[in-house]
Design a protein with these regions (language model features):
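Terminal amphipathic alpha-helical/low-complexity segments used for targeting or macromolecular assembly
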Residues: 1-63, 178-210
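Structural signal for interior beta-strand "rungs" in well-ordered beta-sheet cores
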Residues: 63-171
Length: 210
């Protein structure tokens, strides 16, 4: 798809992603995240053509107007929607694939000061990132994963999994561990009951001998 087609998709995101959307005029006043992504498209256009001062100037103005710090060197796919927008930070080497939903206060940050290396996360298709979540370092969030609000993610998250907490853990794995623990506990209880019965039988046998 061409440049303008991608921007048209950006403007269409509130209609499909936000149930509170009512009219196109709201795009001009109530969706700074849409404008942050559109402004990024122009900044990135100049950035990859080595007009980096122009790119940084565009991104700086956009940050002032939208509250989103989106580096023009980041790589964004199609249909990226930043809802509520304020306080979102996306670093220089971040990669975001198509159809990702990002809420306010999210940081896609780095954990290294090295230049010319990938320092920021890769976000695969269909990921949802809750408000205030921090995803740090050169890690990968798998397709259709969900990151809970205020989670701090420093390790890879697999496809279709949900990560929550500080530091983030995988909900499905925690649930599985609990189920395994319950199974072990139930097994131990069963064995204890059998042991108690055996002891009772031995005590009875001893009393009969006496």
């Amino acid at each position: 798809m061409n440049f303008w087609g991608i921007i048209k998709e950006d403007f269409s995101q509130p209609k499909t992603q936000d149930p509170a959307f009512n009219s196109c005029i709201e795009l001009f006043f109530n969706y700074p995240g849409v404008w942050a992504v559109v402004n990024y498209r122009f900044a990135h256009f100049f950035y990859i053509r080595n007009f980096k001062r122009i790119a940084r100037m565009i991104s700086g103005i956009s940050q002032f107007l939208t509250g989103v710090d989106l580096h023009p060197g980041a790589e964004l796919g199609r249909r990226i929607f930043i809802d509520h927008a304020n306080g979102v930070v996306i670093g220089q080497t971040a990669i975001i694939e198509d159809d990702v939903l990002i809420y306010q206060g999210v940081t896609l940050g780095g954990t290294s000061l090295e230049k010319d290396t990938k320092r920021h996360p890769t976000i695969k298709k269909g990921v949802i990132i809750g408000s205030g979540a921090k995803i740090l370092g050169n890690i990968t969030i798998g397709e259709n994963a969900k990151i809970g609000s205020n989670a701090v993610v420093v390790k890879d998250v697999g496809a279709n999994l949900t990560a929550v907490g500080i530091p983030a853990y995988i909900v499905e794995e925690r649930r599985k561990n609990k189920e395994n623990t319950r199974a072990v506990d139930a097994n131990c209880e069963d064995k204890l009951e059998k042991l108690e019965r055996k002891i009772a039988e031995l005590e009875k046998a001893l009393s009969d001998i006496k």
